[in-house]
UniProtKB/Swiss-Prot annotation:
Pfam families: FTSW_RODA_SPOVE
GO molecular function, one term: glycosyltransferase activity
The protein's name: Peptidoglycan glycosyltransferase RodA
Post-translational modifications: Phosphorylated on Thr-463, probably by PknB and PknH.
Regulation: Phosphorylation at Thr-463 may be important for modulating interactions with other cell division proteins, thus regulating the cell division process.
TM region(s), chain numbering: 20-40, 50-70, 76-96, 115-135, 146-166, 183-203, 226-246, 248-264, 267-287, 312-332, 344-364, 386-406, 418-438
Description of the deletion phenotype: Deletion of the gene does not impact in vitro growth, but it leads to aberrations in the cell length. Deletion enhances sensitivity to nisin and vancomycin. Also exhibits hypersensitivity to moenomycin. Mutant shows compromised bacterial virulence in the host.
Keyword Cell membrane applies: yes
Topology within the bilayer: Multi-pass membrane protein
Length: 469
């Protein structure tokens, strides 16, 4: 008879996925959103109609579905990403609903913008769930880097080629108008081009790290290696000139510079890139009237407070009215600012929530950005690192451009505030961005699968007992 004693098997407990914490935070975001709606209704002397209750139920159902998609297909995703974005989206809905109440009093439109924004939120969350479900590995995107780059360029170019009646609004040719709705393709271009930049920088890293001459302590790239930077410069200046969209131009170009710097760790690329952009902007200032007008309005908006400077002047008055603590939700007059639900929603929050409330909102964005950068640090592959860092940096740059524009720190650009401003294109694109970031986060936090070693200590080895019969 032979008896074989097996070695004990060590069982490692699975790492916590923290999905229950995410669900709890989502419920907290829903409570804050609904409470803010009640405050608006109370301060506007409104009742609590069924529509308001349906907003809260729909909000909780939508993000509960997104939570289930993450729990099933990406359980190791950072638990803070979705709840923080849900809260930002909810606060945006509250402000849009608050502006609807004013519009209804003066009879400007029949269809509330909050209902349309809720519909776009449904589309955005559905897109988020689809990306989380079907994008099994973020590294698959690197295979389609050149296709994404070509698609991103096409999306940028189409509005410039269309007639003004189909693409121009408020002086910028950035739209594609279709029957029943409009699309702003630049919102999707920023994601597609970031995928392209990340894939190319991983595959062609040597092209960007080749040593050249030294100047002022910096290692300059070789002249023949400047082609990618010059191409990005031409594209960004072309968008600024032909589509009259300074915001998209600045966002795309600075995002490219950030990714290049992260890939090469050479500050010379940033210096050369910013010098080229400044030179292009200076030339455009003297040649093109719309660029010159935008800069002059930024420098002195009170020179024409009822004309070209009206938007920024009203925005500054809103911040001044809000002060430190704000007038309270529903108690201010944010409707006096043009485009308060889109380009100037930050000014609307600044008036009714004050500096304290606006700082809290900016801290929510900071949480998303920092968690995205932490994901980039934790990711094991180079493509994922660059893409996660690029997506997070794009959010940071866009937020800086928006806040800087409405506070007159930089020229007004017309970019929307992610997840808060009214608009389907921005909402849909940013939920896709969040889904990709969530997928990268899942890959970074997921425990590695390791095969057990064949070697075992002598004490755990099998023994044989041979019995004579």
């Amino acid at each position: 008879m032979t008896t074989r004693l097996q070695a004990p098997v060590a069982v490692t407990p699975p790492l916590p996925t923290r999905r229950n914490a995410e669900l709890l935070l989502l419920c907290f975001a829903a409570v804050i959103t609904f409470a803010a709606l009640l405050v608006v209704q109370a301060n506007q002397d409104q009742g609590v109609p069924w529509d308001l209750t349906s907003y809260g139920l729909a909000f909780l159902t939508l993000f509960g579905s997104a939570h289930l998609a993450i729990r099933r297909f990406a359980p190791y995703t950072d638990p803070l990403l979705l709840p923080v974005v849900a809260l930002l989206n909810g606060l945006g809905l509250v402000m849009i609903h608050r502006l609807d109440l004013v519009d209804n009093e003066i009879g400007e439109h029949r269809h509330p913008s909050a209902n349309q924004q809720m519909l776009w939120t449904l589309v955005g969350v559905a897109a988020f769930a689809l990306v989380v479900t079907f994008l099994k590995d973020h590294r698959q995107l690197a295979r389609y880097g050149y296709i994404c780059g070509l698609a991103g360029l096409v999306f940028l170019a189409v509005p410039a080629l269309l007639p003004a009646a189909l693409s121009e609004q408020n002086g910028a040719k950035i739209w594609i108008r279709l029957p029943g709705f409009s699309i702003q393709p630049a919102e999707f271009s920023k994601i597609l081009l970031l995928i392209f930049f990340s894939a190319v920088l991983v595959a062609k890293r040597g092209l960007f790290t080749s040593a050249g001459k030294h100047l002022l302590g910096m290692t300059l790239p070789r002249p023949r290696d400047l082609a990618p930077l010059l191409a990005a410069w031409v594209i960004s200046v072309g968008v600024m000139v032909f589509e009259k969209d300074l915001g998209a131009s600045l966002l795309l170009y600075t995002s490219f510079l950030v990714v290049v710097y992260l890939a090469t760790q050479r500050f010379s690329w940033v210096v050369i890139g910013l010098t080229l952009f400044a030179a292009g902007t200076l030339v455009a200032y003297f040649i093109f009237e719309h660029v010159r007008l935008r800069v002059q309005t930024w420098l002195d908006p009170f020179a024409d407070p009822d004309g070209t400077g009206y938007q920024i002047v009203q925005s500054l008055f809103s911040f001044a009215t809000g002060g430190i603590f704000g007038t309270g939700l529903g108690n201010g007059q944010p409707d006096t600012v043009p485009a308060a639900s889109t380009d100037f929603i930050i000014a609307a929050f600044g008036e009714e929530l004050g500096l304290v409330g606006l700082t809290a909102i900016l801290m929510l964005y900071t949480i998303v950005i920092i968690r995205g950068l932490r994901t980039a640090i934790a990711t094991r592959d180079s493509f994922g690192k660059l893409l996660a860092a690029g997506l997070s940096s794009t959010l940071a740059i866009q937020l800086f451009i928006v806040v800087g524009g409405v506070t007159r720190l930089i020229p007004l650009t017309g970019l929307t505030t992610p997840w808060m401003s009214y608009g389907g294109s921005s909402l849909l694109a940013n939920y896709i961005l969040l889904a990709i970031l969530a997928r990268i986060s899942h890959g970074a936090r997921r425990p590695l699968r390791t095969r057990p070693r064949n070697k075992s200590p002598i004490t755990a080895a099998g023994t044989e007992v041979i019995e004579r019969v």
